[in-house]
Amino acid sequence: MLGFIIRPPHQLLSLLSCPGLRIPRFSVLCAPPRLRTMAASSSFSELPLVAVCQVTSTPDKEQNFKTCAELIREAARLGACLAFLPEAFDFIARDPEETRRLSEPLSGNLLEEYTQLARECGLWLSLGGFHERGQDWEQTQKIYNCHVIMNNMGSVVATYRKTHLCDVEIPGQGPMRESNSTIPGPSLESPISTPAGKIGLAICYDMRFPELSLALVQAGAEILTYPSAFGSVTGPAHWEVLLRARAIETQCYVVAAAQCGRHHEKRASYGHSMVVDPWGTVVARCSEGPGLCLARIDLNYLQQLRKQLPVFQHRRPDLYGNLGHPLS
């Protein structure tokens, strides 16, 4: 099914720019019918195309990889230069003990499979939240929630370990203690250059801390990515609001690949993966099931908007300090 959102013609993002392409199952793509002619223009079709994948991870790592690989191959077939996977793309366990048992180091078999997949497809990958056994695994028996960027040759070019852990008690959603099995990362990662633009790395709960996004944009980020696994209570209330807020305040594209559906008897996720442009408009989104959506990234539009609305020139650190001080 197509979902239509009326939005400025210079930022229309959809598959309609690629005549003859088959729309993937479960995708929802944003394009008002009256702008289809414009969407097929050569200048629009030359913009970088990104794919945002939505999955329902379970404790079955092999099946999870098969699902993700199918979506990545579809993204490559459709002409994307970069595919985004959600937090916990590798698995979602039933308890901390199962999390520890299923986790791997970055040098393990699973990332080697993704290395081969990136080479096969010629695609950059944002692997949004890998359960990593770090160098301190033997001492701590805890993992890092690690966001991995892999280039189209299969090389890991950036890693970010989630710095804000989700230890919360939400009525109707149940308690969550990420710190039971996870260590917070020690630092932020400088934005990484990709074919789609300079990407600032974050994960899920990080989006609730605007200082992080401000630090990333002041360090040069053009795209902020929040791979996530939002729950069924916080999702409807906060998901889109937070993503649009981060896009507006930083004047960045925001890409948010999400987990969806029921993972096992103890957990379900909200879904609704999306891309938000620097104006704050949702330009692509997935429906509730597994699938992908596509968006084009227009960095000229981003720069134009930053010139027209120069909020970073108007900041007053003399009054409130430099929130989100640039990364060193």
Swiss-Prot record:
Keyword Zinc: yes or no?
no
Q: Which Gene Ontology CC terms are recorded?
A: mitochondrion
Q: What is its EC number?
A: 3.5.1.128
The active site is formed by E87 (proton acceptor), K162 (proton donor), C204 (nucleophile)
Q: Which UniProt keywords apply?
A: Cytoplasm, Hydrolase, Mitochondrion, Transit peptide
Residue stretch of the organelle transit peptide: 1-37
Q: Which Gene3D superfamilies match?
A: Carbon-nitrogen hydrolase (3.60.110.10)
Q: According to its UniProt record, where is this protein located?
A: Cytoplasm; Mitochondrion
List residues of the CN hydrolase domain: 47-299
- Principal place where this protein is found? cytoplasm
Q: Which domain of life is it from?
A: Eukaryota
What function does this protein fulfil? Catalyzes the hydrolysis of the amide bond in N-(4-oxoglutarate)-L-cysteinylglycine (deaminated glutathione), a metabolite repair reaction to dispose of the harmful deaminated glutathione. Plays a role in cell growth and apoptosis. Has tumor suppressor properties that enhances the apoptotic responsiveness in cancer cells. It is also a negative regulator of primary T-cells.
Q: What is this protein called?
A: Deaminated glutathione amidase
Which gene is transcribed and translated to give this protein? NIT1
